[in-house]
Amino acid sequence: MTQNNPFVLAADIGGTHVTAALVDTNTWQVIDESTVRHSVNSHADAKSILSAWSVPFREVIRNRLAPATPLIGIAMPGPFDYENGISHMRYQDKYDNLYGMDIRMELAERIGAKGRNIRFINDAAAFLQGEVFAGRHNGSPKVLGITLGTGLGTAVWERGSNAMDADLWKTPYLDTNAEEHLVTRWFVRKASQHGIAVTGLRELLALRGTHAAIVANILTEYSSHLLHFIRFFSEKEATDRLIIGGNIAKAWDIFRSFNPTAFDRFHIRISQLGEHAALIGAAAQFA
C-alpha cells in the first residue's frame, strides 16, 4: 500500500462462500465494481476448497488491475493460527480437510502472490474493525461485536487498539457450548426434531404460514439463547455497546420482538455494512 496505490485486496471467507474486493484505504470504502463472490463447498477435499477460494482473488487481480504483487488481507473463521496462516478448523462442520495446512503458502501459490503480503484476521474481529473504521461505534470507548451465521464470532474493540477475537464460541452453555445454540445448524436441528427439513433460518421463516406454532416456538427459544449470550458477553466485558452482524442478524427484529424490554437494556446496533465490514476490517491490517 502506497500513496500511489492505496488499494488492498481484501477477502471474507465464510462457511459457504468467499468474497473478494479492492478496498481504498484512503476512504475505507469497498470498490463495489471490483467485488467477486464465489461459492465453496466447505466439506470438499482440501484441493477443491483451496481452488474455490483462489478464484475470486485471481478475478479481482485480472479485472481491476490490482498490483501484480498485491497486499492481501483475509478475514478467516477460526480456530486458526492467524499469525502463521495455519488452519486449526476441525469439528466445526466446515473446512475440516484443511486442518494443519499452511493456508498462506497454499493461497500464495494459487494466486501468484507473495506469502509475506498475505495477512489473516479473525472474521469476527474483521467485522468489528470494519464497523469501527466506518464510524459505526458512535464515539463509544469500547464496543463488542457478534456475528451469527454458520459459526459464532465474537470480538472486542477498545479505543486506541485494534479489534480482537474474543473466542467465546466454545463457552460452555447448557448441554454443549454457546455456538451450538446460536448458529445455522441449530435451526436445522430444531426443525428436524419437528419433522421439518430446512437448510437454515431463511427456509424456516418461509414456513411461518404453514407451521406457525412450531416456527414461533423455535424462534422464541433462539431469542432466549441470544439474550442469554448477549447478557453474558456484556457483563464479561463491562460494556452494553454491541454491534451484531451475520446472516442470522437480518432477522434481529423478530428475535427482539419476543422480549423487547430485556434486549433494549443494551445499546445494540445491527450492521448495515454487511460483508463490507469484514472486507474493510481485513484491509485495515495494512493501515
Task: Give the location of each predicted region.
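Short, hydrophobic alpha-helical segments
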Residues: 61, 283-287
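A short acidic Gly-Thr/Ser loop motif
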Residues: 11-17, 146-151, 247
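Feature marks short, surface-exposed loop/turn motifs that line or immediately flank catalytic pockets
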Residues: 17, 78-82, 152, 250
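Conserved phosphate-binding loops in N-terminal lobes of ATP-dependent enzymes
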Residues: 3-78
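Glycine/GP-enriched mid-protein hinge/lid loop-to-helix segment characteristic of carbohydrate kinases
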Residues: 5-7, 23, 34-37, 45-46, ...
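Glycine-rich phosphate-binding loop and adjoining helix at the ATP-binding site
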Residues: 42-54, 71-72, 78-142, 253-264
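Adenine-nucleotide phosphate-binding core of ATP-dependent small-molecule kinases
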Residues: 39-65, 188-254, 258-260, 267-278
